[in-house]
A protein has these predicted regions:
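C-terminal beta-signal and adjacent terminal beta-strands/loops
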Residues: 701-721, 752-808
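N-terminal periplasmic accessory domains that precede
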Residues: 87, 108-110, 133, 158, ...
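Gram-negative outer-membrane beta-barrel transporters
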Residues: 392, 398-402, 469-475, 586, ...
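Structural signature of Gram-negative outer-membrane beta-barrels, strongest in the C-terminal barrel
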Residues: 259-263, 391-394, 406-408, 453-594
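Membrane-embedded beta-barrel scaffold of Gram-negative outer-membrane proteins
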Residues: 209, 323-352, 527-531, 564-624, ...
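Transmembrane beta-barrel wall of Gram-negative outer-membrane proteins
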Residues: 200-282, 320, 381-387, 392-408, ...
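Short acidic/polar hinge/loop motifs at secondary-structure boundaries
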Residues: 122-125, 129-162, 210
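N-terminal Sec signal peptide and the immediately downstream disordered periplasmic leader
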Residues: 1-82, 88-93, 213, 264, ...
Length: 808
């Protein structure tokens, strides 16, 4: 990305607060007032660096210690001192939060071990298990969790456990909330930030960001944010499309929000957000590729962070959001309305030459046909309207409540094409004249697979929650009634496709998700809570198998489930938690047990290059999570967060061969989830002179072992038989791999000098010991055509300079 793409806008809010410590909590307030309280509270007072973090996890403002369930908030200062630039980086510091990296812009989020396996780009019907919000706007989208820039965020909240009562479907495991800094009346302030970094044995990264807050008279203010970041690549590609650092990328965007308060009671906040994220390649470290491997002539053994390409790859996500939040304070109650529109245009362009070439070998094509470059292009176009309106109490009495309605309309169109120039000529020459035209089903030439899947999803919901405090006890109860309808068409064609057309497939569901919480507060420093809550995820319909690609055994095993519906996933979460905060110490912990019914597990259908969803009748997660922070000495802050989760299937598929293939066996682990995860951070701050202070920060992060898909834990280590006699490879060539993703440890260091005039200079090293973590396993055609792992970023050394100014 060229430097001219970077936008600069002026100036800064003060850094946000350090981890939460006890003080007298604010009275709860409703809705938009709540966020104003939170924004103002999450600023460091002039005389004290430690203050309570205020969150709006219950759609009311309260301290983390007063929220009656498990919640974490990473503040702006936490994000800055961790040098984090993605949700994945944040997740390693949050107990119970896991982000599986499946390539740029393609992340799966799970909370507390509620995970159903790897969702891939061609499963648009699979719903997310964690809801994601930008302030009040729903932005969740299954695999494509938006990789939003973290600049000028007030905080990132992680709400653990099902949140369907207040946040709806998609929050079956939990909810992530990106909370932005809001416009401030009567204040001119801002910040500029510049960064440069170098990736070990990789490319240079750099970025420029800015924010400005300015008054528009006495009753309005505007806040504008702009940012541009270039991410240095670190994967080297061999082959005709090879090059150094092919997975570099960029993220450019901004947002503008306006606050208008014509009267003290009325607040109107329109906002527009735009972001374009791109990657010029994927972070895939290959072990075997049809075109280059230890058996080809000449042989090739891949080194660390290498891959082989016939075509360059690309990811692009253009996201536009327009929303309007309005509130009116009637005195005892406040009315809030949130209207939002989201438009996303996503492209995943992969080098699928190994996939297409492996099929061509099976079909007996000559080498020239096998060597054709083949580009799998998956596009997703999303238009989503949502409307929420709610009423909430605003007083300080013992009874507090919120009640509202929600509606959403989603149009999602998924296209898949496999352009392979010259392919039809080899098809007709090998399989008979006219074959390519006969299987096209109306699609264009030289594309052996094509599919169109338009979806329309409508949701209506009513929700409410109330709490009553009497003496040391508080009882909270609420629920959400929902009604979903999903309509889907499926049209495909080409040599690899079954050539089927389904119009108007419909999935419907309605129900009620309750939550009950009891809280005991024997004193102002301690609270104990117990909870029972239900979560829900909408079902759907499986796609048909790509029969041409299937082996006879795979077709017999998986065809009974193809083009069949799968049921809604539901769960009940039971937990008990404790929150303690006194003086320099804060300790929060929870134990939980989740019973899952009809878990929607995603599996690979062998060599068919198809994915199916299976309902597993019973599964569970049981675990404990804890977060501890302390301020034992002046200037020294310590924090420790960790979780242990035992997540397992409690059912076995009746067919023993299918059970082994899929890994859906009683006692097997749920995929993508580490049993143990922890993070420890230490920060020491001291005055440098009468005009500045310096600090050093060190963090250690441990992520335990995981499996990408449930079937990976069967017959592991596993031998993949390629059976592709091409380019010198024998028919019996095989590769043996351990599919258990090993645990990994990261150490990050930073040191900064912060001046009283708003200037800050930070030097940092992320991944100090240059760990090469395996984040997920990548396979093509059940491992026959390609094998590899998505890996993490190498050691990165950088410098960030910030300048804050204004404030009056």
């Amino acid at each position: 990305m060229r430097a001219s793409s970077y936008l600069l806008i002026g100036t800064a809010l003060a850094a946000l607060a350090a981890p939460a410590f006890a003080q007298t909590p604010p009275a709860e307030t409703g809705n938009t007032q709540a966020e104003e309280v939170a924004q103002n509270a999450n600023q460091p007072p002039a005389t004290e660096a430690n203050t309570d973090i205020i969150v709006t996890a219950t759609k009311r403002a309260s301290t983390i210690q007063d929220v009656p369930f498990s919640v974490n908030a990473q503040t702006e200062e936490d994000i800055q001192r961790a040098n984090a630039n993605s949700l994945e980086a944040i997740a390693r510091n949050v107990a119970g939060l896991t982000v599986q990296n499946l390539g740029p812009g393609q992340s799966q989020v799970s909370v507390r071990g509620v995970s159903a396996g790897q969702i891939v780009r061609d499963q648009p019907g699979v719903k997310e298990q964690v809801g994601v919000y930008l302030d009040e706007s729903v932005i969740s989208l299954s695999l494509f969790t938006p990789d939003l820039d973290l600049f000028d965020l007030n905080r990132v909240e992680t709400l653990r456990g099902p949140q369907g009562t207040l946040f709806g479907s998609g929050s079956v495991g939990g909810t992530i909330r990106y909370i932005t800094n809001q416009p401030k009346l009567g204040r001119t302030e801002g910040m500029v930030e510049a960064n440069v970094n170098t990736v070990d044995e990789g490319d240079i990264g750099y970025g420029l960001k800015g924010v400005i807050n300015a008054p528009l008279g006495d009753t309005a203010a505007v806040r504008a944010v702009a940012y541009g970041t270039h991410f240095g690549g670190f994967i080297d590609a061999l082959g005709p499309a090879g090059g150094k650092n092919v997975n570099d990328g960029s993220r450019v965007g901004g947002r503008v929000s306006v606050l208008w308060e014509p009267t003290p009671e009325l607040k109107i906040t329109p906002r527009v957000v735009y972001q374009e994220a791109e990657a010029d390649g994927f972070n895939r470290q290959e072990v075997y590729n049809l075109y280059a491997n230890p058996f080809t002539v000449p042989p090739l053994n891949f080194k660390q962070r290498q891959q082989y390409l016939l075509l360059r790859e690309k990811f692009r996500d253009k996201t536009a959001i327009a929303d309007l939040t309005a509130s009116y304070d009637f005195g005892p109650v406040e009315l809030t309305s949130i209207t939002s529109y989201i438009h996303r245009d996503i492209l995943v362009s992969r080098d699928a030459s190994a996939l297409t070439g492996s099929v061509s070998v099976d079909l007996g094509f000559p080498d020239a046909g096998v060597n054709l470059p083949s580009n799998l292009r998956d596009t997703t176009k999303l238009k989503q309207w949502t409307q929420e309106a709610r009423l909430a109490s605003t007083g300080t009495g013992p009874f507090q409540w919120v009640f509202g309605g929600f509606y959403s309309h989603v149009d999602r169109i998924y296209h898949q094409r496999l352009p392979t120039p010259g392919y039809d000529a080899f098809v007709d020459a090998t399989l008979g004249a006219g074959t390519s035209a006969a299987v096209a089903n109306g699609f264009g030439p030289d594309s052996p697979y094509n599919a169109d899947l338009p979806y329309v999803i409508k949701q209506t919901a009513l929700f409410g929650e109330g709490s009553y405090r009497f003496n040391q006890f508080k009882l909270t109860a609420g629920g959400r009634w929902y009604d979903f309808k999903e309509t889907r068409d499926f049209i495909n064609g080409g040599l690899f496709a079954p050539g089927l057309t389904f119009i108007g497939d419909t999935t419907k569901s309605n129900g009620f998700s309750p939550r009950v919480i009891a809280t005991w507060e024997p004193n102002r420093n301690l609270s104990v809570n117990i909870q029972a809550a239900k979560g829900f995820r909408l079902g759907g319909i499986n796609d048909p198998l790509n029969e041409t690609l299937c082996s006879p055994e795979d077709f017999a095993l998986y065809s009974p489930f193809a083009a069949e519906s799968y049921d809604d996933e539901t769960l009940w979460n039971y937990e008990a938690g404790v929150k303690y905060s006194k003086g320099p110490i804060t300790f929060n912990a929870a134990v939980f047990h989740t019973q899952i019914k009809d878990l929607q597990v995603t599996v690979d259908a062998g060599e068919c290059s198809s994915r199916l969803v299976f309902n597993v009748p019973k599964a569970h997660t049981t675990g404990v999570e804890a977060e501890f922070s302390a301020h034992p000495l002046p200037g020294l802050d310590l924090s420790l967060a960790g979780s242990y989760v035992d997540s397992q299937f409690d059912s076995t598929i009746a067919n023993p061969i299918l059970a082994t293939r899929t890994g859906i066996i009683d006692g097997n682990r749920l995929p993508t989830v580490p049993r143990f995860q922890m993070a420890a951070t230490a920060t020491y701050t001291q005055r440098f002179n009468d005009r500045a202070e310096w600090y050093v920060n060190a963090s250690y992060q441990h992520v335990g072992s995981r499996y990408t898909q449930p079937g990976d834990q069967e017959n592991n280590p596993r031998t993949f038989f390629h059976e592709l006699p091409f380019n010198g490879q024998p028919l019996d060539a095989s590769t043996t791999l351990n599919l258990k993703l090993p645990a990994y440890d990261l150490v990050n260091l930073s040191a900064g000098l912060s001046f009283d005039n708003g200037m800050e200079v930070v030097a940092y090293v992320n991944n100090l010991f240059d760990e090469n973590p395996k984040l997920s396993f990548d396979r093509e055609r059940n491992g026959r055509a390609r094998l590899g792992f998505n890996v993490g970023q190498p050691r990165t050394i950088g410098v960030t300079v910030r300048k804050k100014f204004g404030g009056g």
